[in-house]
UniProtKB/Swiss-Prot annotation:
Lineage: Eukaryota, Viridiplantae, Streptophyta, Embryophyta, Tracheophyta
NCBIfam families: kup
Gene assigned in the entry: HAK14
Stretches of the chain found on the membrane's Cytoplasmic side: 1-112, 177-240, 297-305, 381-388, 439-478, 532-535, 582-859
Organism field: Oryza sativa subsp. japonica (Rice)
Keyword set, alphabetical order: Glycoprotein, Ion transport, Membrane, Potassium, Potassium transport, Transmembrane, Transmembrane helix, Transport
GO biological process, one term: potassium ion transport
Official protein name in the record: Probable potassium transporter 14
Annotated localization: Membrane
UniProt xrefs under InterPro entries: K+_transporter (IPR003855), K_trans_C (IPR053952), K_trans_N (IPR053951)
Length: 859
C-alpha cells in the first residue's frame, strides 16, 4: 500500500487513471478525485509504505498474506464514496464548520497588552539577566590591559547579540514553530509531519487529514524538497541520526535548565558582596540555595498566575539596564560607541589572540536565553515576540553593556562584579533587589521551557511518561511536571554546592547553550530545505554563518571541560541514554506487538461469538497498535469465560501536531463483519492537547463518535445503493459514480448531474439534504432498519456497563541476544517502564471497571 505524509510533501496520484490534486488552505483540504484514484480513503495503512500506487495496492489484495488487511481493504474499496470540497472532518461528514485552532482567534487590544506584559515575564527573563555575569566571565582568566581590550570585548558582545538572538532566533528560528510551539522537539515534530522519519511505525494516513495539517500543490519548486523527503524516509540511518541529534539537543536543554537557575541567582546574590563587604562566598552559596528552594516551590502556580506579576518587574529591570547604561556613558564618556565598528574584534584578536579566544566562552553568555526564548514561545505570537525583542529587549541590553564597558574603560582593574560596581550609589539597593527578582524570573523561564520540551518528547515517544498538571484554564501550553521540577531542584542545588562560583558555572553554562544552539541550527536548516523551500544559497549562508560561529564558540568552551564542565556533560549523557533507551524499548515493543497480532482468518474461524460466550456490555481494550487486532486480545479470550457483546480496540495515539480538534479526536473502523460488533478506535491527541476528561466523559465522547461513524457509514451505503441501482444505463452509472460532493453541511450531491438550482430544471433531482431516491425503496428501508438496530444494540450494551480491558505487555530480550541488549531491555528499560506513569492513569478508572491480563513478548 502507498503511504503519504502531510505537510508540504508530495501528492501521489496513481492507479486507474485517477489523479489527485491538492492545494494549500488554512485548515482544510480541497480534493478533486476521479473514482479510479479514490483509494486514499483507506485509513489504516501499511507501516512500511510498500507498493507505490493505488493500483498496485488494489492488485495485491488478492494475494496479501495478512487477511486482516485484506478484509479492511475490501471494506474500504466497497465504500466507493468519493469526496470533493472542503474536508471538514476526517470522520464525520455532518460537520458544519472546519475545526479551527484556538490561536487563530482574533485578539483584542486589551488582550494584546496583557500578552505583551506576560511575554516579558515568560520569554525574555533568561536573556535579560545576562549582563549580570557576561563581562565577569569574559575577563575572569586574563586581566584587562588596555581600553582597546574593552572595546574589542564589547564589539564581540554587540555582534553576538545581533547574530544569535536577533538574526538566528528572532528573525529566523521563531518562524520554525509548530503552530505556536517552539523548541527542539517542535522542530522535530514539524519534520515528522512533513516526512515519515519517526522510528515508531504507527502513522496513519488519516493523521494527515487532521485540520492542523496543511498541504501544498506539487510543482517544480518542490522537486528539491521531495528529493530530501524521499531520502529521509528511505534511509534508516538518517532517521536514527536525526533522532540522536534531537535527543542530544533535548538533553542539553535539560542540562541548561539546571545551570541557568544556579548561574542567574548566584550572580544576582553576588551583588550583596559589593554592598556588604562582610558577606563571603559561603554565605552567597547558602542564600542562593534558599532562593532556589523558594523558586522551585513556587513553580507549581504556573506561568499565567505569575507572569502578570513578574512581567512589570522585568519591564522595570530592562529600564534599569538602559538607565544605568545611559548614566555610565554620560559619566565616563561615550567612546564605547566605537565598538559598533567590527574592526575592533580584529584588533582584539591581533593583540591578544589567546586572551580573546578564551573570552569567547564568556561572550557567548550574553546570548544565553535565546533557546529558552524559542522554546517558551507557547501561546505568544511570533510577531509579538519579535517586536518586543527588537524594540525593547535588544536596545536595553545594548545600553546595559555599553554602560558597563564605559565603566571598565575608566576602571580597568575592576573586572569582577562589573554590573554592581557600575550602579550609581543612590540606586544600588533597589537595583540589587530587582536583579535578584529578575534572576528568579529568568530561572522560571528556563524551567518552563523544560516542562514544554518534556511534554513534547513524551508525546513523541522519546521520554518516560510523567504526571503533567495544567496550570491554566485559558492556555493549554502552560504546564507543571512535579517530578521534573524536584529533579531540577536537586540537580541545581548539587551544581551550586559543587562549583560555588559563577565563573566555574559559567563555563558549564556555555557548553549547555552551545549544544542546544547547534542542534537548532541543523533542524532549522532541514526545515528550510524540506518545508520552507528557500533558495539553496540562502540556506547555505544561514548554515555556514550560524554553525561556523557556534563551532568557534564551542572551541573556546571546550578548554574549560577539565575545570569542571565535564560534570555537565556526564549529566547530559545520562539524560540522553534515558531518552534513547525509552525510545528504543518502545519501538521494539510496538514492532513485536505488530508481529504477534491476531489474524483475521482466526477470528473468522471462531465465528461472531469468538469461540466463547458474548455477554451484554461494552469492552474497551486498550492497546498501542494503530492497526490490526492485538495479540493480548487472544489472552482475554483464553482466560475469560465470556467476552462482551461489543468490543472496541482503543489506541491512544499522539500525532505530530500541536492540537487535534475535539470533533476529529476519534477515528473508527470495523474490524470484522457487522455481526461481530467489533471496532477499532484511535483516539488522537496532539502534543499540546490536554487529556483532562475523566473516564465517564471519555467513554461518552467515544460512544457518540461511534454512533456518528455508523450514521456516516449508513449514509455512504445509501448513496451507493442509489448510484448503482437507480440508474438506467452503464453510462449513467459511470457519470453518477465518478464524482460526488460532500458539502460542508454534510449534504451529498452528485457531480455527474448538476443541482436543480444551477441547471434551471428539475429533470435530474439533486441528492441533498432533502434527497429523493430513485433506487429501491426496500433497500433504503432495510439500510435504515439496520442502522436503527445497531444504534439500539449500542445503547443496550452501554446500559449493561462499560469495562476497561487492560493488557500489560512486557518485553524481555531473548536468551541468544547480545549482553548489551539484555542489559538495556531487561534492566534499564524495564526499570523505566515500572516507574513511569501509566497512560491509563490519566482517565482515573475505578478498579471495579478494570480487567487486566499480562503478556510477555520476547524480542
Amino acid at each position: 500500500m502507498e503511504t503519504r505524509s502531510g505537510g508540504s510533501g508530495s501528492a501521489s496520484g496513481g492507479g486507474g487513471g485517477g489523479r489527485m490534486r491538492l492545494r494549500k488552505t488554512e485548515s482544510a483540504e480541497m480534493r478533486w478525485v476521479v473514482s479510479g484514484g479514490a483509494y486514499e480513503e483507506d485509513e489504516i495503512e501499511s507501516s512500511d509504505g510498500g507498493g507505490g500506487t493505488p493500483a498496485a495496492a488494489s492488485g495485491s489484495r488478492g494475494g496479501c498474506s495478512d487477511s486482516d488487511d485484506n478484509y479492511e481493504e475490501a471494506e474500504m474499496l466497497r465504500q466507493r464514496l468519493v469526496r470533493t470540497g472542503p474536508r471538514a472532518d476526517s470522520l464525520d461528514v455532518e460537520a458544519q464548520d472546519v475545526a479551527g485552532m484556538n490561536r487563530h482567534q482574533e485578539i483584542t487590544v486589551g488582550r494584546s497588552i496583557v500578552l505583551a506584559v506576560q511575554t516579558l515575564g515568560v520569554v525574555f527573563g533568561d536573556v535579560g539577566t545576562s549582563p549580570l555575569y557576561a563581562f565577569d566571565v569574559m575577563f575572569n582568566k586574563y586581566p584587562i590591559t588596555s581600553k582597546e581590550d574593552v572595546l574589542g570585548a564589547l564589539s564581540l558582545v554587540i555582534y553576538t547579540l545581533i547574530l544569535i538572538p536577533l538574526l538566528k532566533y528572532t528573525l529566523i528560528a521563531l518562524w520554525g514553530n509548530d503552530d505556536g510551539e517552539g523548541g527542539t522537539f517542535a522542530l522535530y515534530s514539524l519534520i515528522c509531519r512533513n516526512a515519515r522519519v519517526s522510528l515508531l511505525p504507527n502513522q496513519l494516513r488519516s493523521d494527515t487529514r487532521i485540520s492542523s495539517f496543511q498541504l501544498q500543490v506539487p510543482s517544480v519548486e518542490l522537486e528539491r524538497s521531495l528529493k530530501i523527503k524521499e531520502r529521509l524516509e528511505t534511509s534508516s540511518m538518517l532517521k536514527k541520526l536525526l533522532l540522536m541529534l534531537v535527543l542530544f539537543g533535548t538533553s542539553m536543554v535539560i542540562a541548561d535548565g539546571v545551570v541557568t537557575p544556579a548561574m542567574s541567582v548566584m550572580s544576582a546574590v553576588n551583588g550583596l558582596k559589593v554592598g556588604i563587604s562582610s558577606v563571603n562566598e559561603g554565605e552567597v552559596v547558602m542564600i542562593t540555595v534558599a532562593v532556589l528552594i523558594v523558586l522551585f516551590t513556587l513553580q507549581r502556580f504556573g506561568s499565567s498566575k505569575v507572569a502578570l506579576a513578574v512581567g512589570p518587574a522585568l519591564f522595570i529591570w530592562f529600564c534599569c539596564l538602559a538607565g544605568i547604561g545611559i548614566y555610565n556613558m554620560k559619566t565616563y564618556g561615550s567612546a564605547v560607541l566605537q565598538a559598533f565598528n567590527p574592526m575592533y574584534i580584529y584588533y582584539y584578536f591581533e593583540r591578544n589572540p589567546t586572551q580573546a579566544w578564551m573570552s569567547l566562552g564568556g561572550c557567548l553568555l550574553c546570548a544565553t536565553g535565546s533557546e529558552a526564548m524559542f522554546a517558551d514561545l507557547c501561546y505568544f505570537s511570533v510577531k509579538s515576540v519579535q517586536l518586543t525583542f527588537v524594540f525593547l529587549v535588544l536596545p536595553c541590553l545594548l545600553l546595559g553593556y555599553l554602560g558597563q564597558a564605559a565603566f571598565l574603560m575608566e576602571n580597568l582593574t575592576e573586572n569582577q562584579q562589573v554590573f554592581f560596581l557600575s550602579i550609581p550609589n543612590q540606586a544600588f539597593w533597589p537595583v540589587v533587589f530587582i536583579a535578584i527578582l529578575a534572576a528568579i524570573i529568568a530561572s522560571r523561564t528556563m524551567t518552563t521551557a523544560i516542562f514544554s520540551t518534556i511534554k513534547q518528547a513524551t508525546a513523541l515517544g522519546c521520554f518516560p511518561r510523567l504526571k503533567i498538571i495544567h496550570t491554566s484554564r485559558s492556555f493549554m501550553g502552560q504546564i507543571y511536571i512535579p517530578m521534573m521540577n524536584w529533579f531540577l531542584l536537586v540537580s541545581c542545588l548539587a551544581f551550586v554546592t559543587m562549583f560555588g562560583s559563577i565563573n566555574e558555572i559559567g563555563n558549564a553554562y556555555g557548553i549547555a547553550e552551545l549544544g542546544v544552539m547547534m542542534m537548532t541550527t541543523v533542524l532549522v536548516t532541514i526545515i528550510m530545505l524540506l518545508i520552507w523551500q528557500i533558495n539553496i544559497i540562502v540556506v547555505l549562508c544561514f548554515l555556514t554563518l550560524s554553525l561556523g560561529l557556534e563551532l568557534i564558540f564551542f572551541s573556546s568552551v571546550l578548554g574549560s571541560v577539565a575545570d569542571g564542565s565535564w560534570v555537565l556533560l556526564v549529566f547530559a549523557a545520562v539524560l540522553y541514554l534515558i531518552m534513547y533507551i525509552w525510545n528504543y524499548g518502545t519501538k521494539l515493543k510496538y514492532e513485536t506487538e505488530v508481529k504477534q497480532k491476531l489474524s483475521m482468518d482466526l477470528l473468522m474461524e471462531l465465528g461472531c461469538n469468538l469461540g466463547t460466550v458474548r455477554v451484554p456490555g461494552i469492552g474497551l481494550l486498550y492497546n498501542e497498535l494503530a492497526r490490526g487486532v492485538p495479540g493480548i486480545f487472544g489472552q482475554f479470550l483464553a482466560t475469560m469465560p465470556a467476552i462482551h457483546s461489543m468490543i472496541i480496540f482503543v489506541c491512544i495515539k499522539w500525532v505530530p501536531v500541536p492540537v487535534v480538534p475535539q470533533n476529529e479526536r476519534f477515528l473508527f473502523r470495523r474490524v470484522c463483519p457487522k455481526s461481530y460488533h467489533m471496532f477499532r478506535c484511535i483516539a488522537r491527541y496532539g502534543y499540546k492537547d490536554i487529556r483532562k476528561e475523566d473516564y465517564i466523559s471519555f467513554q461518552q465522547l467515544l460512544i457518540e463518535s461511534l454512533e456518528k461513524f455508523m450514521r456516516r457509514e449508513a449514509q455512504e451505503r445509501s448513496l451507493e445503493s442509489d448510484q448503482y441501482d437507480g440508474t438506467d444505463s452503464e453510462e449513467e452509472v459511470a457519470s453518477a459514480s465518478s464524482r460526488a460532493l460532500v458539502g460542508p453541511n454534510g449534504s451529498i450531491n452528485s457531480l455527474g448531474v448538476p443541482p436543480a438550482e444551477a441547471a434551471g430544471t428539475t429533470e435530474h433531482p439533486t441528492i441533498g439534504s432533502s434527497m429523493s431516491f430513485d433506487g429501491s425503496l426496500d433497500e433504503a428501508i432495510d439500510g435504515r432498519g439496520s442502522l436503527d438496530d445497531e444504534l439500539s444494540f449500542i445503547h443496550k450494551a452501554k446500559e449493561s456497563g462499560v469495562v476497561y480491558l487492560l493488557g500489560h505487555g512486557d518485553i524481555r530480550a531473548r536468551k541468544e541476544s547480545f549482553f548489551v541488549k539484555k542489559l538495556v531491555i531487561n534492566y534499564f528499560y524495564a526499570f523505566l517502564r515500572r516507574n513511569c506513569r501509566r497512560g491509563i492513569a490519566a482517565l482515573s478508572i475505578p478498579p471495579s471497571r478494570m480487567m487486566q491480563v499480562a503478556m510477555q513478548y520476547m524480542v
